[in-house]
Regions:
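Catalytic-core regions built around general acid/base machinery
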Residues: 22-30, 52-56, 89
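PLP-dependent aminotransferase class I/II
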Residues: 59-137, 144
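PLP-dependent enzyme catalytic core of the Aspartate aminotransferase-like
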Residues: 22, 168-169, 179-206
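Conserved PLP-binding catalytic core of the aspartate aminotransferase-like
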Residues: 124-125, 137-169
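Short, conserved active-site loop motifs that form the nucleotide-linked donor/cofactor pocket
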Residues: 3, 33, 59-60, 141, ...
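Short beta-strand-to-loop capping motifs
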Residues: 82, 154-157, 190-192
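Active-site phosphate-binding strand-loop segment of PLP-dependent enzymes
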Residues: 1-45
Length: 206
């Protein structure tokens, strides 16, 4: 009852699943504090962004990034969206300097490439489905979690073993076995067609 702010990640990391929009709407409506929804992976999701709900709920903040679908993690650019009242409070406490001009120009340049970004996202989603189909056939894969992101969370027989086997082959995945409810889970980022071919070939050899 004393909670002032609630952070949610949808699509979630590391599971990749999205929260149901109706459930989120009810939560935002009933929660007395601020609700921040991190939509870093929203471009890969079949579910729409909740940005349109900002005008409906006074306690909603949406955050997004150019690190994922836009492939620009190096410029470290994130965005926050909310109503005028909340933004005015944030402006009072944030550092005095905004993003540098090089970052700003690069971001504006990339935002014009709508069709190219959509094409890249569709390619990743297509490769994700192919990768899932392959993973389902592996004996050491016990479960594949539904994903709305550009990665797949996979439960295997022994996450530490499989992680190290892949690492020795020059392939880095995320070992999430020490995270709560993720025992023996690996998070695999979906690569390009050629990268996935290498991954599939390597997994076949384990």
């Amino acid at each position: 009852s004393n909670t002032k702010i609630l952070f949610l990640c949808s699509p979630n990391n590391p599971t990749g699943n999205s929260f149901d929009i109706n459930i989120l709407s009810d939560l935002i409506k009933d929660f007395k504090g601020i609700v921040v929804i991190d939509e870093a992976y929203i471009d890969f999701s079949s579910q729409k962004s909740l940005i349109n709900l900002i005008g409906k709920y006074e306690n909603l903040i949406i955050t997004q990034t150019m690190s994922k679908a836009y492939g620009m993690a190096g410029i470290r650019l994130g965005m926050g969206f909310s109503n005028e009242k909340i933004i005015s409070y944030i402006n009072k406490i944030k550092p005095p300097y905004n993003i540098n001009i090089l970052t700003e120009n690069k971001a504006l340049e990339e935002l014009k490439k709508v069709s190219e970004i959509k094409s890249n996202v569709n390619s990743i989603l297509n490769q994700k489905e192919k990768l899932i189909s392959f993973l389902e056939k592996l004996d050491f894969v016990e479960k594949i979690y539904e994903s709305d992101a550009n990665f797949i969370l996979v439960k295997v027989d022994n996450a530490d073993l499989r992680y190290n086997q892949l690492l020795k082959k020059g392939i880095v995945v995320r070992n999430r076995t020490n995270q709560y409810l993720c025992q023996n889970c690996l998070r695999i980022t979906v690569g390009t067609k050629d990268e996935n071919k290498i991954l599939i070939k390597t997994l076949n050899e384990l």
